[in-house]
Amino acid sequence: MSSEPAYERLGAKVLSLPDVIAQSVGFMGPIFSSAFVIPLVVGVISASGKGGGVAAPLSVIIAAIGVFALGWIVSSYAREIHSAGSLYDYVTRGLGKRTGTAAGWLYYGGIVVLAAGLLLLIGGYLQSTIQSEFKVSPLPSWAWTLIVIALIAVILYFGVRVSTRSQLALALVSIIVVTIFFVTVIVKLGSANSAKPFEPSSAADGWSGIFFGVLYGVLLFVGFETAANLAEETPNPRREIPIAVMATAGIATVIYVVATYVTVAGFHYSLKTVAAAAGAPLFALGASKSAGGYGGTWIDRLLELVVLFDMLAVAIGCCVAATRGIFAMARDRRVPASLAVTSKKHGSPLGASAFVIGICVVALLLNQFWTSLFALPQTPHYFAMFAWGSTFGGFALVVVYFLMCIGSLRSFAGAERRASIIVAAVIGLVITGGAIFGSFYKVTSPTIEAPYYAVALLVIGFASTFVLRARESASTALADLSASASR
């Protein structure tokens, strides 16, 4: 008789379709990305010096095609595997246990590092925004970060429904407000609206620039697939997870195309003007008419508030995805079993939550006491830490997307949908391969160190398979975590 302990379980299956969509949209943070990342796609802040330029919306559309291809693969796996491990289980199914374990280390390690960096940014954003708008500074940035960490710890403890409903409220408010603002800008532009942003000839560097815009544009969508981490807590994951993944890709595409168009058109199709506002183009557009914007003081303050809301949604989404994935890996003994401990009352992953919160606290201490770590010239240290962490996280996730695409060719070789999988995998490999290239091309120190550290984590994850005594994946050992249980 086997003495192997039973597989640990998460809480009840209580999530609805809006909940799992909220996880993907919340993690992705379309308003946060629209506020700060669009200039990267345009090319005015990219390491390569290239981007889509005036044709940046076209770059986003092409990137979205690649994301839909990735979404098709994720959806295909999600119909078969209903485990909280998501991409870790998908890569395991396609490329074997060792590579799957390494991918899990990289994927969830990337999300944790991204979350830690983002929490530092939220603290700095709160302190600097309150200081600039109201000329007071009630708390230093580290204190704001600590408060947000504590808030997220409470949300994680009380269960997944609290987490997803928090994301839904924060993301929905921010999307509605910013969408109304974008429509207002388009209306005010009047006859200045143009189809130029959708014409390849508008790109200063031609198709080369558009290509680089696509590479950076893919990063806008990172995290769109994380609804899959909630499969175990969803009554009908075979139906709802694929819908959530593809719906999120669609929602994001519309928001990003409109946001990129408004950024380019709102600054009168001038890359110099976009570059001048590259630090926060959304807020520059929200400024008064005399300052070259389309709003005023109260509009700008409202935009600052909803961007904060979206940042909080991203932070919650990162922590929810990371805790579920780490729990799943610990349950399979791919990482220490203590990380699979759950709350008896709420069914939340206590061990994984404590680990993620602990890493965020360590990052806060590093930010405070090791001020030369990943430092950038004339840049607040919290922002430098975020820039490094987001580079690490974005690269980590894109590499795992790449591995998932390769594995899908094997996983679905005999499936009825194999033709569509082959097409999606080829498109996905091209898009993610390009994004990986963009993570290295002309990137300078210390940012260039991030992908190398990520590769090191991938190697460590692979090496761990020779040390840790893993067991059969729950996604294959437990009947309700496979397709047959929900048919």
Predicted regions span which residues?
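A generic transmembrane alpha-helix motif of multi-pass inner-membrane proteins
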Residues: 29, 387-388, 392-400, 406, ...
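Membrane-interface loop-to-helix entry segments
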Residues: 15, 140-191, 205, 245-253, ...
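Transmembrane helix-loop boundary segments of multi-pass membrane transporters
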Residues: 40-57, 129-141, 161-170, 302, ...
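TM-loop-TM module centered on a large, flexible mid-protein loop between adjacent transmembrane helices
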Residues: 89-91, 96, 128-132, 244-316, ...
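Membrane-helix boundary/coupling elements in multi-pass transport proteins
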Residues: 83, 106-123, 221, 226-233, ...
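Extracellular loop-to-transmembrane helix junctions
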Residues: 30-136, 141, 448-465
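Helix-loop-helix junctions that connect adjacent transmembrane segments
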Residues: 6-11, 53-57, 133-142, 168-304, ...
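Membrane-interface "cap" regions at the ends of multi-pass membrane proteins
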Residues: 1-54, 67-68, 72, 194-198, ...
